[in-house]
Every structure is written in C-alpha cells, then in structure tokens.
C-alpha cells in the first residue's frame, strides 16, 4: 500500500501499515511510474484525469469530492460502460450490518480511527479553518455535547 503524507508524518503513516509513503510537500505522486489497482483520494487533491495513467488496466479511482464541475459523478456514470479504468463515487447509505461490522473491527483493534483534534460547537469556525488549511492529519471531531 502506498500513500502520501507530510515529512513529519511519514513514520506515523508507516506504523498504520503503509509500505510506501510519498512526501506530498516535495513530490508529486502523479509522476510515479508505479501502477495501482485502486486510488482513493480522501481529500480531493487529485482528479481522475491526473490519476488515470497510474491505474492498472481495470483500476479504480474513488474520491470523496465531486471534482471540478461535478466531473467525478459524470465519470462514475460513464466509465463503467467502457470496461477499463473506472471511477466510483461514494454514496453513503445506512446499513445495520455495516455498522455492526465496523463495531467489530474497532473492538478487535483492526480499525483505529485517527483523531487529529477535538473542537466544541462554539469553536466551529476555528475547526472549519483548520480543516480548510490542509494541515490536518486524520479526523477533526466536533463535540456537540458532553
């Protein structure tokens, strides 16, 4: 598994299980010669067009972002028709068996959420600015009540 991280987070990300870590501050991961079966852009910093050359013949690109002008939704609808590289766009659904499965993973220690910072509801503006800064590592939690 390969991922990107800042130089100061490389060892931490390796502890989480990454085999290869690319420092996004000094290297452009889209310039690598490595081919991938799956690329997951969790922060919306890339695009299918940028990542397509990095995907294997049947590779999949998934992003949590809509992309420029909603392009990821368009690609998700049309790329499966051509049988090669494709885009998946996550559409959340509530499914009890998925929640139970996630609960079991957490209880067994297989899934450890990475929490960067906690904010109160009164600090929502500060939390938003921090997330938008691109400096967060993991999740930012907004506490609604104690």
Where are these regions (language model features)?
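Terminal helix/beta-alpha structural elements that buttress the NAD(P)+-binding lobe
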Residues: 1-146
């Amino acid at each position: 598994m390969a991922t990107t991280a800042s130089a100061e987070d490389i060892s931490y990300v390796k502890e989480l299980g990454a085999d290869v870590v690319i420092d996004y501050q000094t290297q452009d991961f889209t310039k690598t010669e490595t081919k991938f079966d799956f690329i997951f852009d969790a922060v919306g910093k890339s695009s299918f067009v940028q990542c397509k050359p990095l995907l294997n013949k049947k590779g999949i690109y998934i992003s949590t972002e809509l992309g420029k002008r909603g392009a990821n939704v368009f690609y998700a609808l049309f790329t499966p028709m051509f049988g090669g590289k494709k885009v998946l766009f996550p559409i959340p659904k509530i499914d009890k068996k998925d929640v139970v499965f996630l609960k079991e993973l957490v209880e067994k220690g297989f899934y450890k959420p990475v929490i960067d910072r906690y904010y109160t509801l009164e600090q929502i503006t500060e939390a938003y600015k921090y997330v938008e800064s691109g400096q967060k590592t993991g999740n930012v939690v907004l506490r609604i009540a104690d």
